[in-house]
Design a protein with these regions (language model features):
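Catalytic cores and adjacent flexible loops of soluble metabolic enzymes
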Residues: 1-205
Length: 205
């Protein structure tokens, strides 16, 4: 809380998003510390529900997802739905979840989350392609357990993802996330995408 509050009061022009569990208290804290938006973390896979949230079933998952996103939107926060462990979730469950979520709460974006870094780039491409039907901007969040974070991020971009989550030098949880510098240089040199990023600041970062 204090770290995010310090960042939001620093005068930066960047949009600052706070992670939050699917709880009103967390969402209120994000609002209080001045965040532009909130990234709402909710489990989606059967294995996460079984071992981390054993009292939840699919109906509970959907209800909490809709409730938390609707509450964040009510507070005026940009709302990113971050259903973690997306890539190990049952596809029928995801379809039911997303169709209900978009109809009843309509988050500003949906994140596809490869929590344990087990998804091949081709599978990430499939996920993004399939979820485009919901008409909501899509984001990709990868981990590097099998060295696929950057490749999977580019696969998501090719499939139509609007945002790629990255970390400088890939310094994220466990084996890390997609490296900011790899994504930025790949977009410029491999895809020929012009952008206004200050690439000269990569080394200093």
């Amino acid at each position: 809380f204090n770290a995010i509050k310090q960042i939001t009061s620093s005068g930066t022009k960047a949009k600052i998003y706070s992670f939050a569990r699917g709880m009103h208290e967390d969402i209120e804290a994000a609002k209080e510390c001045g965040a532009t938006g909130v990234v709402i973390e909710i489990p989606t896979s059967e294995v996460k529900l079984k071992y981390q949230f054993p009292k939840w079933d699919t109906d509970t998952l959907i209800q909490k997802s809709v409730d938390s996103c609707a509450y964040a939107k009510k507070l005026g926060l940009e709302t990113i739905y971050f259903g973690f462990d997306t890539c190990r979730a049952d596809m029928a469950t995801l379809d039911r979840l997303y169709s209900t979520l978009v109809a009843e709460a309509r988050p500003d974006a949906i994140g596809v989350v490869d929590t344990v870094g087990c998804c091949l780039p081709s599978a990430v491409h499939m996920f993004i392609s399939r979820l485009k039907k919901y008409g909501v901007p899509l984001q990709i969040h990868t981990h590097n357990d099998f060295g696929m974070a950057t490749a999977s991020s580019f696969a998501a971009m090719e499939a139509g993802a609007n945002v790629i989550h990255t970390c400088m030098n890939g310094l994220g949880e466990r084996t890390g996330n997609a490296a900011t510098e790899q994504i930025m240089m790949g977009m410029k040199l491999m895809y020929g995408l012009d952008n206004d990023y200050h690439l000269e600041k990569i080394q200093a970062s």
